[in-house]
């Protein structure tokens, strides 16, 4: 890529990268009229396709939830890629592991590669806090901190989120849940809509199982949308309203 092309694209791509942090929205949800899936008594996997209103399909995102006697382990895989005219302009690959005991995060380990080499973030519960170590140093977050990752709706009480790619902490404001409907692959289903005010404006829809079926970040680059493509072990299908 020429220096000129890189300069012309750097601004929207930088904003797009920030927009991809929209996974924060479920990690900081307030209580609402949805059915809790926080207990995670059986294994489950959530697979999302990711699209951008300008760049089109840009990748996939998945969470695999594995309960055990000692708590819950969440394995996350992410792959994002932006191409224009057949030329790759941006990519991001990430693998992350969270370990939970009840509603407390006890450890976190993530590796993110945005094309400049892997960047590692680690965290562990210590006393009344959660100690996060990254390339930017070591900080202590509140014990209630949650990673920006939508694996269930048990993240109902924390307004503090951790960016999994950098380890940065952010405070957010959460709106009340609104009962509504949302279209997923042409099918209209009942859902609860939340709006979250952080560094970017976010919207998330949870179905009656408490599963985040869709979430969107909207900024001046356009909309980045995560849509649930497959949900393994999630229980009965959500209520459908109308036909495809």
Region annotations inferred by a language model:
Residues 42-126, 210, 217:
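N-terminal mature ectodomain segment of secretory-pathway/periplasmic proteins
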Residues 4, 32, 51-54:
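Solvent-exposed, non-transmembrane regions of integral membrane proteins
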Residues 55, 71-79, 91, 97, ...:
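Gly/Pro-enriched, hydrophobic low-complexity segments
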Residues 36-40:
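Boundary at the C-terminal end of the N-terminal hydrophobic targeting segment
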Residues 56, 80-87, 116-121, 137-143, ...:
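Short, surface-exposed beta-strand/loop "edge" segments at domain boundaries and coil↔beta transitions
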């Amino acid at each position: 890529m020429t220096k000129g092309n890189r300069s012309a694209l750097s601004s929207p791509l930088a904003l797009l990268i920030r927009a991809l942090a929209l996974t924060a929205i479920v990690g900081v949800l307030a209580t609402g009229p949805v059915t809790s899936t926080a207990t995670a008594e059986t294994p489950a996997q959530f697979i999302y396709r990711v699209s951008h209103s300008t760049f089109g399909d840009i990748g996939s995102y998945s969470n695999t939830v594995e309960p055990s006697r000692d708590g819950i382990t969440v394995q996350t895989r992410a792959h994002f890629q932006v191409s224009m005219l057949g030329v790759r302009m941006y990519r991001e690959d990430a693998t992350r592991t969270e370990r939970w005991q009840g509603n407390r995060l006890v450890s976190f380990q993530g590796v993110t590669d945005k094309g400049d080499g892997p960047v590692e973030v680690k965290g562990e519960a210590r006393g009344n806090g959660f100690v996060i170590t990254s390339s930017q140093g070591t900080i202590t977050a509140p014990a209630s901190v949650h990673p920006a990752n939508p694996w269930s709706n048990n993240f109902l009480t924390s307004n503090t989120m951790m960016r999994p790619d950098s380890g940065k902490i952010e405070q957010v404001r959460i709106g009340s849940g609104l009962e509504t409907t949302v279209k997923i692959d042409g099918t209209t289903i009942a859902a609860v809509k939340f709006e979250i005010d952080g560094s970017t404006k976010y919207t998330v829809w949870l179905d009656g199982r408490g599963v985040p079926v869709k979430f969107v970040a909207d900024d001046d680059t356009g909309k980045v949308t995560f849509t649930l493509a497959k949900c393994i072990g999630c229980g009965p299908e959500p209520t459908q309203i109308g036909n495809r």
